[in-house]
């Protein structure tokens, strides 16, 4: 509660600044740029990081590329195209992650009124760890999308046993990727939503909604902060709390069919949650 009170006081101070003090100043311009990109999270970010530094790390555009995304690409250029690399060197968490994902998916796929088993899309796929262990055993075909060409090249050999079921590899950043309209029974988005700004995550979820077949579902699985929003300087990602995440989901035109916390991870880890989402047009 103390944190929440401080947060509201901080928000009130910034609102006064917006309205009265610096509408035409450089600080207002920087503040407005960050707020445009992180409209749900920016006040939490500003509480932890000075305005000018936060702008330089996120919304500043250099050589046509927003620094929030440029810095993430630099980070992943150094990540090996292995299962260990995909798990951030926490390979011991891979098996409990896969098992929980399989069990969660099973609740929403197959049978009347559920998603079909035709085609799945693996977003932020890396080398295809989730595709190999979770999606390919269930779906007739799978597509992968990732911004790193090196990961997708490795995926072709990593998934070689199932190569006849891999429909295509898309080398795109998710903020630039549009799923085919009405094509997918399941769109899987794991450990990648934090690499999108609030603005781009909202837009991407909306495009994914349009990519679903009738009764299709989006499975969103990611770290969820206990409170507020946390910016990781090392890999240029944000971890949002449940309120922020659910607000973005709602604004994207999706509703939560079910949610479940990942079990079997060490207590010191940031909590990981799974969400099953579908279009509010079918509610």
UniProtKB/Swiss-Prot annotation:
<feature type="binding site">
    <location>
        <begin position="174"/>
        <end position="175"/>
    </location>
    <ligand>
        <name>S-adenosyl-L-methionine</name>
    </ligand>
</feature>
<dbReference type="GO" id="GO:0071885">
    <property type="term" value="F:N-terminal protein N-methyltransferase activity"/>
</dbReference>
<comment type="similarity">
    <text>Belongs to the methyltransferase superfamily. NTM1 family.</text>
</comment>
<dbReference type="GO" id="GO:0005737">
    <property type="term" value="C:cytoplasm"/>
</dbReference>
<dbReference type="GO" id="GO:0005634">
    <property type="term" value="C:nucleus"/>
</dbReference>
<feature type="binding site">
    <location>
        <position position="124"/>
    </location>
    <ligand>
        <name>S-adenosyl-L-methionine</name>
    </ligand>
</feature>
<keyword id="KW-0539">Nucleus</keyword>
<protein>
    <recommendedName>
        <fullName>N-terminal Xaa-Pro-Lys N-methyltransferase 2</fullName>
        <ecNumber>2.1.1.299</ecNumber>
    </recommendedName>
</protein>
<keyword id="KW-0949">S-adenosyl-L-methionine</keyword>
<feature type="binding site">
    <location>
        <position position="190"/>
    </location>
    <ligand>
        <name>S-adenosyl-L-methionine</name>
    </ligand>
</feature>
<keyword id="KW-0808">Transferase</keyword>
<dbReference type="InterPro" id="IPR008576">
    <property type="entry name" value="MeTrfase_NTM1"/>
</dbReference>
<dbReference type="InterPro" id="IPR029063">
    <property type="entry name" value="SAM-dependent_MTases_sf"/>
</dbReference>
<feature type="binding site">
    <location>
        <position position="129"/>
    </location>
    <ligand>
        <name>S-adenosyl-L-methionine</name>
    </ligand>
</feature>
<comment type="function">
    <text>Alpha N-methyltransferase that methylates the N-terminus of target proteins containing the N-terminal motif [Ala/Pro/Ser]-Pro-Lys when the initiator Met is cleaved. Specifically catalyzes monomethylation of exposed alpha-amino group of Ala or Ser residue in the [Ala/Ser]-Pro-Lys motif and Pro in the Pro-Pro-Lys motif. Predominantly functions as a mono-methyltransferase but is also able to di-/tri-methylate the GPKRIA peptide and di-methylate the PPKRIA peptide (in vitro). May activate NTMT1 by priming its substrates for trimethylation.</text>
</comment>
<dbReference type="GO" id="GO:0006480">
    <property type="term" value="P:N-terminal protein amino acid methylation"/>
</dbReference>
<keyword id="KW-0489">Methyltransferase</keyword>
<feature type="binding site">
    <location>
        <position position="146"/>
    </location>
    <ligand>
        <name>S-adenosyl-L-methionine</name>
    </ligand>
</feature>
<dbReference type="Pfam" id="PF05891">
    <property type="entry name" value="Methyltransf_PK"/>
</dbReference>
């Amino acid at each position: 509660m103390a944190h929440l009170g401080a947060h509201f006081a901080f928000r009130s101070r910034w609102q006064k600044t917006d309205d009265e003090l610096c509408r035409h100043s450089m600080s207002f311009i920087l503040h407005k740029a960050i707020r445009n990109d992180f409209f749900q999270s920016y006040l939490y970010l500003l509480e932890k990081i000075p305005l000018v530094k936060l702008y330089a790390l996120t919304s500043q555009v250099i050589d046509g590329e927003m620094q929030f995304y440029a810095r993430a690409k630099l980070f992943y250029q150094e990540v090996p195209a292995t299962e260990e690399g995909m798990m951030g060197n926490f390979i011991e968490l891979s098996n409990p992650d896969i098992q929980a994902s399989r069990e969660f998916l099973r609740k929403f796929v197959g049978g009347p009124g559920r998603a079909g088993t035709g085609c799945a899309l693996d977003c932020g796929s890396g080398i295809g760890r989730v595709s190999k262990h979770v999606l390919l055993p269930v779906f007739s075909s799978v597509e992968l999308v990732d911004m790193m060409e090196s990961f997708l090249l490795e995926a072709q050999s990593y998934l070689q046993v199932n190569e006849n079921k891999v429909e295509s590899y898309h080398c795109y950043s998710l903020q630039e990727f549009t799923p085919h309209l009405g094509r997918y029974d399941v769109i899987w988005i794991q450990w990648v939503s934090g690499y999108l700004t609030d603005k781009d995550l909202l837009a991407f979820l909306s495009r994914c909604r349009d990519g679903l077949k009738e009764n299709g579902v989006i499975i969103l699985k990611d770290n969820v902060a206990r409170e507020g929003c946390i910016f990781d300087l090392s890999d240029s990602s944000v971890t949002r709390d449940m309120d922020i995440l659910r607000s973005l989901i709602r604004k994207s035109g999706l509703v939560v069919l079910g949610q479940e916390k990942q079990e079997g991870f060490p207590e010191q880890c940031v909590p990981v949650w799974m969400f099953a989402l579908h279009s509010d047009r079918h509610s």
